[in-house]
Amino acid sequence: MEGVLNFLTNINVIFTLLGYLIGGIPFGYALMKIFYGMDITKIGSGGIGATNVLRALQSKGVSNAKQMALLVLILDLFKGMFAVFLSKLFGLDYSLQWMVAIASILGHCYSPFLNFNGGKGVSTIMGSVVLLIPIESLIGLTVWFFVGKVLKISSLASILGVGTATVLIFFVPYMHIPDSVNILKEVDTQTPMVLIFIFTLIKHAGNIFNLLAGKEKKVL
């Protein structure tokens, strides 16, 4: 019993669980329910992120669909950022900060508040890593926005955005940047971000097949 109590009161465990719970807050689901009486998990792809929210609202002719989708995107991004910010605020070491980031991503994708359903996690991914690898993340966010704006293919923008940040972690750390934002100085490996990118590819497997077949839908 004492071992269980020690485990549950361990600050690393507490913050990992907290990161998971924060990431699990289903903003897209909540806003759609509150303002439109719609269950976003039963519409379109069933995802709770900005893309499905946008498609669902535009299909109903809602005039402020883009604004609501943008709000969902921002909230999903900031919940990942907030989880990591708390871990930094309380002085957790970098390896635990990365663990909290990953936990927040898993929380979004497998929300405990939605029977472990959720979204694909890209907004939360970019938010959670921006305080850990800001240079790579901001460039990745730029690519994500640019591809999404020009090609209007959300899945491709997401994959390229996270992919860009992942590729950059093999170059940026060797430049003259502060140790506090250098992944090799933080955890001595690029593995956490590589795993996040692999997870992104897995979550977008269906989209990748559609892209290769030329059948992937554009954002309306």
UniProtKB/Swiss-Prot annotation:
Cross-referenced SMART domains: G3P_acyltransf
Location in the cell: Cell inner membrane
EC number: 2.3.1.275
TM ranges: 11-31, 70-90, 96-116, 127-147, 153-173, 193-213
Single GO cellular component term: plasma membrane
GO BP field: phospholipid biosynthetic process
Record's bilayer topology term: Multi-pass membrane protein
Keywords: Cell inner membrane, Cell membrane, Lipid biosynthesis, Lipid metabolism, Membrane, Phospholipid biosynthesis, Phospholipid metabolism, Transferase, Transmembrane, Transmembrane helix
GO function terms (MF aspect): acyl-phosphate glycerol-3-phosphate acyltransferase activity
Family matches, as Pfam families: G3P_acyltransf
Recorded catalytic activity of this chain's protein: an acyl phosphate + sn-glycerol 3-phosphate = a 1-acyl-sn-glycero-3-phosphate + phosphate
Pathway stated in the Swiss-Prot or TrEMBL entry: Lipid metabolism; phospholipid metabolism
Principal cellular location given in the protein's record: membrane
Cross-referenced InterPro entries: G3P_acylTferase_PlsY
Free-text function comment from the UniProt entry: Catalyzes the transfer of an acyl group from acyl-phosphate (acyl-PO(4)) to glycerol-3-phosphate (G3P) to form lysophosphatidic acid (LPA). This enzyme utilizes acyl-phosphate as fatty acyl donor, but not acyl-CoA or acyl-ACP.
Family that this chain belongs to: Belongs to the PlsY family.
Subunit structure: Probably interacts with PlsX.
Protein name, as recorded: Glycerol-3-phosphate acyltransferase
Organismal lineage: Bacteria, Pseudomonadati, Campylobacterota, Epsilonproteobacteria, Campylobacterales
